[in-house]
Amino acid sequence: GHFMYDGSLFCNAIKNKTFESAIFFGPSGTGKTTLARLIAQEMDLDFFEINASTTGIKELKEILEKAKVKFFGLQKQKTYLYVDEFHKWNKLQQDSLLKALEEGVVRFIGSTTENPYFSVNNAILSRVRSIYEFKKLSTDDIVKILHNTLDNKERGLGNHSLVWQEEALHALADLSGGDARIALDT
């Protein structure tokens, strides 16, 4: 992303383990969830990942209770909470996060495909440190992702001795419409 370059405030906050709450917004397949997972890994905190379309207030409150025990207990440790599709929660559901954010119990990233200025409560927006916009990936970006997947022996297809034509990768990248998931799933 345009905010992810060496020495940026974004990268320094992750490196220094000071990354606070944020909203990620942009089209599907642009890396919002992947980046949230990488940040959580770097922050070395308990991590909960939920999807707003399948998780209700009851489950959220259970997570926040566990987080409070960690934060107010002996460990004094924050919990990292990632909520995918955050815009799918209504005002009441979004508001159920407020107290935990105010108390500093959780570090929170909400991701959304909707403009957060219209889909996220003002009370939540005022408590997150930053809002980051993700753009559709370029054809070149998608080709790099495809190459990485085809070449990576540990987490990709590198052990399968696959042969591909460069033109085919570019065509696939063009057809994906800037969505890495579509390119990888095709």
Residue ranges and their predicted role:
Residues 20, 76-80, 103-109, 130:
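Loop/turn-to-beta-strand initiation segments
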Residues 176-186:
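The conserved phosphate-sensing helix
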